[in-house]
Each structure stands twice: as C-alpha cells, then as structure tokens.
Design a protein with these regions (language model features):
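Histidine-/acidic-rich catalytic cores in large beta-rich domains
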Residues: 1-221
Length: 221
C-alpha cells in the first residue's frame, strides 16, 4: 500500500503483513491488501466537514488476508480476512482475525454445518474464502457514542462480510459488539428491513452530513 503526493513522490508505504515465498523467487514482504484501506481522520472514506484524512501522520487500517487452519470451522485451509492497523512508522498497533471469533457471528447450527462442508473452496488458490469481507472503516464520531453507547466508540471498526451477509462492529478487545445478520429474522426490526445480500461499504454517515449517525449500506441483492 503506497501513498504518493501530488508530485508523484512516495511519502508512505506499508508491505510488512507477510513474508511471502514463491517457488523460484526470493521471499518478498507483501501487505496482501484487498478491497479497502483507510487513513485516520476520514472514517467514511469520502469528504465530510472536518473529517479530512491525515496525510503526514496517523494510523492506517488495512484489509488484508491470511491463510489459517481452524478445524472448528472447516477441515480445509481458510483464506481469512485480516484487519491490521499500522502506525505512521509501520508498526502494527492492532490486528483482528474473524476466524478467532466465529462463535460471535450468530451462525445457526445449519449454517455452521454448511460452512464446514462448503466454505468457498477455490481449487486454483488452494484455500477457502469463507467470509469475503469487502469493506472496513473506523466507526468515527457519532451521536450513539455521545449518548453513552460504547459499542459505537469512534475507534471501533465497522466491517461487512459479503458472503456471510453480516455487518458488524469489532471493539479494541477483538469482540464483535454489534451485529446485523446473518439471519434477519432474529428481530422484528430486522424482519421489517428484510434480508441484505452481498452488501458493500457499510459505514456510519459522518457528522455534518444529512443522516449523520445512521448506517449507510449498499444492498447488492
């Protein structure tokens, strides 16, 4: 992941997620990022009053990948999403693997059984992408936290799993403290909303914009 200035000069880079060894090549450090990243200061990833991304300091959230073995999920090699937060100097200051928290996803027994047998195996890749998280962001300042709801702490991380149809918030302990899905029959309000399928870019609308504090999400289904 590289940041360049308007003169095309590299002012920041990060590639130290994993040392990858390919046959016939020297080991190479890679970030293994996919889909999303975010710089501190801009929780939604687009312009909002007083919410400009820091360009010469600050933390960066990166959505990456990591292969893991989790026999309680499946007997196949998992390609897990890996959210890592790095300081400006490249030090890893926080990290999260969803597979460590499978019991917090709200999967039914039938869903767990289906995931175990059919976790999204890719023969070419040799691993199973079981969640396909395609977005993550800081929660950012919001009225829910200001009203006393710690689940919506601005530094907590909001993410969306396309394949599991889950939107969640993870706090700094790693716990999933707020969740919508996968079963939208769990609560009358969710049943009225209806099933969200293959969602993209769930985020809290920033302060200073219409609808501030509400969750905005693209329903892909």
């Amino acid at each position: 992941l590289i940041q360049v200035n308007w003169d095309g000069e590299t002012v920041w880079r990060f590639d130290r997620t994993e040392l990858v060894e390919a046959e016939g090549e020297d080991p190479t450090w890679m970030a293994r990022q996919h889909h999303d990243w975010q710089r501190e200061g801009s929780p939604a990833g687009y312009y909002a009053p007083g919410a400009e991304p820091l360009v010469d300091r600050g933390r960066t959230l990166i959505l990456s990948r990591r292969e893991v073995l989790r026999p309680e999920i499946t007997d196949k090699l998992l390609l897990d999403d890996y959210i890592v937060e790095v300081a400006w100097d490249g030090d890893v200051v926080w990290e999260w693997l969803p597979s460590d928290h499978v019991e917090e996803f709200g999967f039914s027994e039938a869903a767990r059984n289906a995931i175990y047998r059919f976790p999204g195996w890719n023969e070419t890749r040799g691993s199973a992408e079981w969640l396909h998280i395609n977005s993550m962001s800081y929660v950012g300042p919001n009225r829910w936290y200001e009203g006393g709801d710690e689940r919506f702490h601005p530094d907590n991380v909001l993410w969306g799993s396309r394949d599991a149809n889950v939107i969640g918030i993870t706090d700094r302990s790693g716990a999933i403290v707020w969740r919508m899905g996968p079963d939208y029959r769990d609560h009358p309000a969710l049943a009225e909303l209806g099933q969200i399928i293959g969602q993209h870019h769930p985020h809290i609308i920033p302060e200073g914009l219409p609808g501030a504090g509400y969750l905005l999400v693209f329903d892909n289904g």
